[in-house]
């Protein structure tokens, strides 16, 4: 029995063998176009701009990660990619500290909960010129770990605004809802 899978883009639905999915997705979704957009983004002038890549996926089983690897392979050598994985219990969600407490920790460059956010994500976010979010669609929403990451960025935002950062995303969705996930990132 042949495994058949499908994917949808804004223009049409295509059917293909399972082993052909990623190469076909790569062509259909314009991985080259995404790589070109990252390379030509209006980054502030830097010798080698840094792109922070946030994900909560398994490298071995993730189509989202596979599409990112294809995109990264097409980026020029002028962009430094810093990948941070937010899975396996490394990230606690924001529990809604009182405003003054969040402000207190944020002004000192941290967060009450510490962890990977304070040790890796905050420093990388300060340095980077752009952020790439790798987002599989889970029930028309960002994954829990990516949502927790966005929530926890509030403390850093109190110290440093993100208006000069470019935002990119790879949203992988089985049938529908990818547009909803993308809107969550920009809202």
Predicted regions located by residue number:
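N-terminal beta-loop-helix "entrance" segment that forms/cooperates
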Residues: 87-106
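FMN-binding flavodoxin-like domain, especially the glycine-rich phosphate-binding loop
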Residues: 1-82, 86, 107-110, 114-116, ...
